[in-house]
Amino acid sequence: MRVVSTDPVGVVSGQTILEFEQTNDMVSARYRGGTILDGYLLGTLDSAGASLRFCYVQVDLHGSVDAGSSICTISHLKDGRLLLREEFQWLTRPGSGTNVFEEMRTTGDDV
């Protein structure tokens, strides 16, 4: 997934790429790019598959470690790709906000 909108107190950017995996209702992802050297998240989907709750931890390019928790609303774009609207709360610093992510097109798809 890629970031399409970032809250001013967020640190993900258009350069941040997230690679998700799912096993039943458990979801994990590794992400990096922009000011994030490496990040991980782990969470669960609700029974309807309409929302995702997770905690994340990340290290930035300066070596600072941050963590937070999020709730994402899951929807679909007209072309069927996933769209996540994340409401996040920092646990290691003040602030909360909203980020938006969309599933990237697979290689060979029309742009």
Which residue stretches match the model-derived regions?
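N-terminal glycine/threonine-rich, aromatic-flanked beta-hairpin/loop signature
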Residues: I17-T44
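Short acidic-glycine loop/turn motifs at beta-strand connectors
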Residues: D46-G49
